[in-house]
């Protein structure tokens, strides 16, 4: 389920997240969320292409499927190869796939602005998903904004600094992410906040949604833990916790976008 990029989804006057998963959440919102409609055959053309431009990242996130490291991996695509990849995406019929540049930390890539400018010049819609590290500066944000990025995503994996910082591996990351959200709003850059639900942070789900609303996020995306990379060492939700989460997501479905929740439709029916 993917909510349309609409600024009111998380800032609707009078809206508030319902209670803790497992309690007695509020009633059905009364209408279905808007969705971005896919009108082409996904067997012939991807809808979104997510390119991990580097494995380099200063953080050591517990769930990282890429097992990011402090330096680029051997075999990372060169700038010329990156241009070739972008050219391949424009070989499809319009509308072209959306391109998301991530990592690792995409800000670790020295030619990030060039890749964005080239993709935009070819008619691609480009978003980025950087890590919030000392590389996340106003100058870099302005540079990617001027290159053509109009949307970015960041991660907020806890309702509190204690939980988020433990998840990301560095103290102060929560506060820096909050500051980054304020910076993006000042610069007029739309952003979404992502979170991965695990047994360690699910108790803070309502607070994470509230934080996303208060910080002015355009969307709040939730993911279930995929036990791969460093994430293989984390505890997944129990069956009962997963069921509670699905009901909670359903009751907040006008404000939350979900990824890989294959049983959510069944819970919509049961609701």
Place the predicted regions along the sequence by residue.
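Conserved alpha-helical substructure of the radical SAM core
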Residues: 2-13, 17, 25-147, 240
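Long, compositionally biased low-complexity repeat segments characteristic
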Residues: 17-19, 262
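A short, flexible beta-alpha/helix-coil linker loop
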Residues: 68-71, 159-161, 227-230
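Short, conserved loop/turn and helix-capping segments at secondary-structure boundaries
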Residues: 76-79, 170-174, 236-243
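Radical SAM/AdoMet-radical enzyme domain recognition
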Residues: 79-101, 109-226
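Hydrophobic/aromatic residues in well-formed alpha-helices
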Residues: 82, 242-245, 269
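C-terminal scaffold of the Radical SAM
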Residues: 215-218, 231-261
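Single conserved hydrophobic/aromatic residue that forms the stacking wall/gate
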Residues: 263-271
């Amino acid at each position: 389920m993917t909510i349309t990029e609409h600024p009111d989804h998380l800032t609707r006057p009078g809206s508030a997240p319902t209670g803790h998963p497992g309690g007695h959440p509020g009633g059905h919102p009364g209408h279905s969320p808007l969705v971005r409609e896919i009108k082409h055959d996904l067997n012939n053309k991807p809808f979104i292409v997510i390119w991990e431009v580097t494995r380099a990242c200063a953080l050591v996130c517990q769930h990282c499927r890429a097992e990011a490291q402090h330096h680029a991996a051997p075999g990372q695509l060169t700038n010329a190869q990156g241009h070739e990849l972008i050219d391949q995406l424009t070989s499809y019929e319009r509308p072209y796939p959306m391109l998301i540049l991530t990592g690792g930390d995409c800000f670790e890539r020295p030619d990030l602005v060039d890749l964005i400018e080239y993709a935009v010049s070819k008619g691609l819609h480009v978003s980025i998903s950087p890590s919030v590290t000392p590389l996340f500066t106003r100058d870099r944000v302005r540079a990617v904004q001027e290159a053509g990025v109009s949307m970015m995503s960041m991660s907020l994996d806890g309702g509190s600094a204690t939980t988020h910082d433990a998840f990301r591996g560095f103290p102060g990351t929560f506060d820096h992410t909050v500051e980054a959200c304020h910076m993006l709003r000042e610069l007029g850059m739309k952003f979404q906040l992502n979170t991965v639900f695990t047994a360690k942070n699910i108790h803070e789900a309502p607070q994470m949604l509230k934080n996303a609303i208060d910080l002015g996020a355009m969307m709040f995306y939730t993911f279930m833990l995929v036990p791969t990379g460093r994430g293989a060492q984390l505890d997944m939700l129990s069956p009962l916790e997963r069921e509670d989460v699905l009901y909670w997501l359903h009751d907040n479905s006008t404000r939350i976008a979900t990824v890989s929740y294959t049983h959510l439709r069944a819970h919509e029916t049961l609701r």
